[in-house]
Structures are given as structure tokens and as C-alpha cells.
């Protein structure tokens, strides 16, 4: 019995060490692209949805470091103000410890309330943006909801499709004029590898006939890609580019609706620590598409780990993309 117990302990320890090795010395994706010119984004205004936590917060932190003026569009203003305060303190401390203490090119950080589950909130937010912001250089559609129980938005849409696709669809369309007048400008859309498991069912976009939270998330992420490709077509010649990305598997609170049995949680935590990206790692492609001169003029492409990737045929179906666009215009009230 003692031998068996010792063997089990050694096996567990060996497994943990192997996972740790994979975490730190394995073939990890290009982990960080830091070290860019701190003034690269100086004078540029960037709007990031869902910037108070996870990928959005990490994206905001790096773009601030690069000198951007960052607007955090967040549903919970109190949490966003708290996150903004933490970011300011962290960046101030980093500047004080830098090669020239007290000298910082860190950009400005602004918090604005935006609830993508409410078209009324989206319209109010955009009206405020158009009244108060003279320019918008980068829009990052980052916010999202993941595999939640069935619920509806304020306007009666299935929550994942409503927030992940329709809310951002309206937001982007209402800000297009400002983006065009600020050109060259960029739109960055955060999708997911899980788009592969989704389909666009035009007969039940609201998932009222049946609801599978995993499938509906994948559908919304496929919609993000189709939206990006159709928008890129419509923006040809405007000097406004739009690209879409997947961040990989990232340790964020996006999966808060997923139930993990108590006995499995320790193993899940170990696996996520070993194999999942940190938010900073996951944000690198968003940062790259928002700031890098390498993608100047590039539009309608799909990226992962800061490089272009191929899409499945269903994500490149132009007729489906146009039909989705037309229906989305009606759903959000851009067309009657």
C-alpha cells in the first residue's frame, strides 16, 4: 500500500513538473511583443469595450504604455473606475522605476458607461462620443459574454448573440463616421477559435426554438468574423481597416458561467495554469492589430498569435455575410 501511495505521489509530482515545464519552456506561442516605442500611439484615441478586466484590461494597459488616449467602454462604471485607478497606479509605478524616473509618455485613460446588452445604452454612448470626441483612431470590439444560461437582452435578443454581435454591430456602425474622419483608422474585432462549431441559422437567430449555450457562443463568434469581412468590403477605399482575431485560450473571468465540479477544480486550475494564456499574453494580437505598422492597410483578415491564419469556408461565405448584415441592420433599428 505504501509503495502504491508513493508511486501515485511521484506520478502526480512528475505530472505537475511536466506541466510546469510545458508552461515555461515548451513551444509557447509568441508570448509577448512588448518593447515597442513608448510613443507609438501618441496622439491616438482608442476605444476598448469591456476594458475593465481580462483581455480588455491588458490591452488597455499596453496601449496606454504606448502613449494612446484610451477610452474604456464598460457596463459597470464603478468596476471600470476601480480598474482605471489600478491601471493608473501600476503605470505610474512602472514609469517611476523606468530608465528615466518621473518621465512618462503614458497616455490618458477615460471611463465611459456602455452596456452592449442595451441598444439604448449603445446609442447614448455613441451620441456622447460624437459630441465629445473629435477623433477615434482605433475601435477594439473586445467585450463578450461566454456560455451563459438562456437569457435575453433589454431588446429581447438572446444574450450572447445580442452582446457579442448585435451590440458591437450597432456600436461600430454609429461610430463609422468618426472613424472615417479620423482615417487612417482601425477596427479590431475579438472573435474565438470556437467559431468553427457555430452556424448561422437565420430561422432562429434568437435561439427560441432550442438553446445550447456552447453552440450559441460559437454562433456569435462566427457572426463576428462574417461581420468583419463584410465591413471590410464596405470600407474599401476609405482608409479605415477592420480585422478579426482569436486570442487563444486565456485565463479570464469570461468562463464564470461554466460549472466545474468541486473535485475537478484543482486539476482544472493546474491545467489552466500550465496551458492557458495569461490575459497579457492573450491580448498581444489585439495590441498588434491596433498599433503595429506591419498591418497598416491590411483589412478583412483573421489573425491569431500576431499572424494571419486561414478561415473555414463557412466564415468566408459572402452571401451569408451580406444576409447577416442586412438582418442585423433591421434587428438593431438601423433600417426599418
Curated annotation (Swiss-Prot):
This is Retinol dehydrogenase 14. Substrate binds at residue 192. Widely expressed. It catalyses: all-trans-retinol + NADP(+) = all-trans-retinal + NADPH + H(+); 9-cis-retinol + NADP(+) = 9-cis-retinal + NADPH + H(+); 11-cis-retinol + NADP(+) = 11-cis-retinal + NADPH + H(+). The keyword Nucleus does not apply. InterPro entries: NAD(P)-bd_dom_sf (IPR036291), SDR_fam (IPR002347). The gene is RDH14. GO terms for molecular function: 11-cis-retinol dehydrogenase activity; all-trans-retinol dehydrogenase (NADP+) activity. Belongs to the short-chain dehydrogenases/reductases (SDR) family. NADP(+) binds at residues 50-56. Its EC number is 1.1.1.300. Shows clear specificity for the pro-S hydrogen on C4 of NADPH and the pro-R hydrogen on C15 of retinols. Pathway: Cofactor metabolism; retinol metabolism. The keyword Kinase does not apply. The active site is at residue 217. Keywords: Lipid metabolism, NADP, Oxidoreductase, Phosphoprotein. One of its GO terms (biological process) is osteoblast differentiation. One of its GO terms (cellular component) is lysosomal membrane. The modification Phosphothreonine is found at residue 5. It comes from Homo sapiens (Human). Retinol dehydrogenase with a clear preference for NADP. Displays high activity towards 9-cis, 11-cis and all-trans-retinol. Shows a very weak activity towards 13-cis-retinol. Has no activity towards steroid. It comes from the Eukaryota. It is an enzyme of class 1 (oxidoreductase).
Amino acid at each position: 500500500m505504501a509503495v502504491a501511495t508513493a508511486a501515485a505521489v511521484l506520478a502526480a509530482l512528475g505530472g505537475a513538473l511536466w506541466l510546469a515545464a510545458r508552461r515555461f519552456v515548451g513551444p509557447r506561442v509568441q508570448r509577448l511583443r512588448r518593447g515597442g516605442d513608448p510613443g507609438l500611439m501618441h496622439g491616438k484615441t482608442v476605444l476598448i469595450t469591456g476594458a475593465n478586466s481580462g483581455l480588455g484590461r491588458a490591452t488597455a494597459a499596453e496601449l496606454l504604455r504606448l502613449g494612446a488616449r484610451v477610452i474604456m467602454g464598460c457596463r459597470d462604471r464603478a468596476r471600470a473606475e476601480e480598474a482605471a485607478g489600478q491601471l493608473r497606479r501600476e503605470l505610474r509605478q512602472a514609469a517611476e522605476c523606468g530608465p528615466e524616473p518621473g518621465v512618462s509618455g503614458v497616455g490618458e485613460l477615460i471611463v465611459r458607461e456602455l452596456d452592449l446588452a442595451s441598444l439604448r445604452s449603445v446609442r447614448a454612448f455613441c451620441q456622447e462620443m460624437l459630441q465629445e470626441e473629435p477623433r477615434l483612431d482605433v475601435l477594439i470590439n473586445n467585450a463578450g459574454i461566454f456560455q451563459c444560461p438562456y437569457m435575453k437582452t433589454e431588446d429581447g435578443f438572446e444574450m450572447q448573440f445580442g452582446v457579442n454581435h448585435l451590440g458591437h454591430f450597432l456600436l461600430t456602425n454609429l461610430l463609422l463616421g468618426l472613424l472615417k474622419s479620423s482615417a487612417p483608422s482601425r477596427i479590431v474585432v475579438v472573435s474565438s477559435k470556437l467559431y468553427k462549431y457555430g452556424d448561422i441559422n437565420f430561422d432562429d437567430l434568437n435561439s427560441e426554438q432550442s438553446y445550447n449555450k456552447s453552440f450559441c457562443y460559437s454562433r456569435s463568434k462566427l457572426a463576428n468574423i462574417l461581420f468583419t469581412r463584410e465591413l471590410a468590403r464596405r470600407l474599401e477605399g476609405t482608409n479605415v481597416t477592420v480585422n478579426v482575431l482569436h486570442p487563444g485560450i486565456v485565463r479570464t473571468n469570461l468562463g464564470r458561467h461554466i460549472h466545474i465540479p468541486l473535485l475537478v477544480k484543482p486539476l482544472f486550475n493546474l491545467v489552466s495554469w500550465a496551458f492557458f494564456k495569461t490575459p497579457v499574453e492573450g491580448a498581444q494580437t489585439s495590441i498588434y492589430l491596433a498599433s503595429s505598422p506591419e498591418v497598416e492597410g491590411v483589412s478583412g483578415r483573421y489573425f491569431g498569435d500576431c499572424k494571419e491564419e486561414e478561415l473555414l469556408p463557412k466564415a468566408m461565405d459572402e452571401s451569408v455575410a451580406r444576409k447577416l448584415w442586412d438582418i442585423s441592420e433591421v434587428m438593431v433599428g438601423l433600417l426599418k
